[in-house]
């Protein structure tokens, strides 16, 4: 009996939204690892990518999905040629990516970066899938809408971000009233020890060089500004039944303790591991079971020391902006996210200075609040409208700085 329990095979019909990005590639690595060891039997329903035809075609030939979608419609012909004779259904454009989210998978990795991931992820949630959520924007922009869809469909939301995944593993959902606070840990990014004066000259190349994690450019910049931690604060307030004022942020440069839960009896439970996204991905893939993962094991003897410090609000104003956004609620977090996305893109293209990312974001928040006042969020369309307004305003502010 014990042997049979140890050899229980995990069976999934899986979709990976954003399969060619960092999280998507790691997800397929986790699936491949478990499958080759006989721990999992996985049918791939759909894979999607934004524009990386070559990698999407390579993944499709290996994992044999029923459906693949490329978001950039101009690349459909190239993808059709690359998969000629493979017998795989091919779609292109945002509607095809949305279709991928609605297809019949019981486990969906939502790893499309940015607002583009909202509709396909919501489709998966409405259908009752277990949604492994790596897209911050879904909960930041439309948290109430997404969580309502999960509850109404009887599905599940499984956080992939290492911090939320850590809390998910040690949070007592049966007795949330016994939780005193959540502690989100942050590496502090590459500029943790830099003065504000030094940060005025930060280049895109420096900002994307994260000290611990391997991530995409946009997420790396968010880590450098600590906006990623601000967005995670907003996410956590949706995932866990804890008010935002009881969610703290603590800088932990080694990225070994991924987050903590403090209970009313002063006990603190933490999840530890090497800084490898495959660990939280494997946790969501096998949930509520566990499966082998190719991540390196933690060597406690080699750690020697773990350090902690409070974040510096004067050097990382994004944290204050995020707290203000979650307190205002409604569409304000969506405005924050859209303005930040536009500002980060401008920084990466050389149009905006590093410290101006938070400056532009703050201006957009204030202007939208002045125009519209507090606005409730009841639908994805309202979130998308706020997103569009914030992006347009951010672009005008960025252009004015260019002039």
Predicted regions and their residues:
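Catalytic, metal-anchored helix/loop core of enzyme active sites in primary metabolism
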Residues: 1-403
């Amino acid at each position: 009996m014990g042997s049979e329990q140890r050899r229980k095979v995990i069976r999934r019909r899986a979709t990976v939204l954003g399969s060619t990005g960092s999280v998507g590639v790691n997800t397929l690595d986790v699936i491949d690892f478990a499958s080759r060891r006989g721990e999992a039997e996985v049918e791939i329903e759909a894979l999607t990518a934004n524009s990386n035809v070559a990698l999407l075609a390579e993944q499709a030939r290996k994992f044999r999905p029923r459906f693949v979608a490329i978001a950039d419609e101009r690349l459909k012909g190239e993808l059709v040629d690359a998969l000629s004779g493979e017998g795989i259904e091919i779609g292109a454009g945002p509607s095809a990516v949305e279709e991928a989210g609605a297809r019949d998978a019981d486990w969906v990795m939502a790893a499309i970066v940015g607002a583009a991931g909202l509709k396909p992820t919501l489709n998966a949630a409405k259908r009752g899938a277990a949604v492994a959520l790596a897209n911050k924007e879904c909960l930041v922009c439309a948290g109430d809408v997404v969580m309502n869809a999960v509850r109404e469909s009887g599905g599940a939301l499984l956080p992939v971000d290492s911090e939320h995944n850590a809390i998910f593993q040690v949070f007592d959902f049966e007795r949330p009233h016994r939780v005193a606070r959540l502690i989100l840990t942050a590496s502090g990014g590459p500029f943790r020890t830099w003065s504000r004066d030094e940060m005025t000259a930060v280049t895109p190349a420096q900002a994307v060089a994260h000290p611990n994690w391997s991530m995409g450019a946009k997420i790396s910049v968010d880590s450098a500004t600590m906006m990623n931690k601000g967005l995670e604060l907003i996410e956590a307030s949706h995932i866990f039944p804890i008010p935002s004022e009881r969610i703290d942020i603590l800088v932990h440069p080694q990225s070994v303790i991924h987050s903590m839960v403090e209970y009313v009896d002063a006990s603190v439970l933490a999840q530890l591991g090497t800084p490898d996204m495959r660990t939280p991905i494997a946790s969501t893939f096998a949930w509520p079971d566990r499966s082998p993962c190719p991540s390196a094991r933690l060597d406690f003897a080699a750690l020697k020391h773990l350090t902690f410090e409070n974040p510096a609000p004067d050097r990382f104003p994004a944290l204050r902006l995020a707290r203000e956004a979650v307190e205002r609620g409604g569409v304000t977090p969506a405005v924050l996210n859209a303005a930040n996305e536009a500002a980060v893109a401008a920084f990466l293209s050389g149009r905006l200075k590093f410290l101006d990312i938070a400056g532009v974001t703050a201006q957009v928040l204030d202007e939208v609040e002045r125009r519209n006042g507090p606005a409730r969020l009841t639908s994805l369309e309202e979130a998308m409208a706020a997103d569009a307004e914030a992006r347009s305003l951010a672009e005008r502010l960025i252009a004015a700085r260019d002039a």
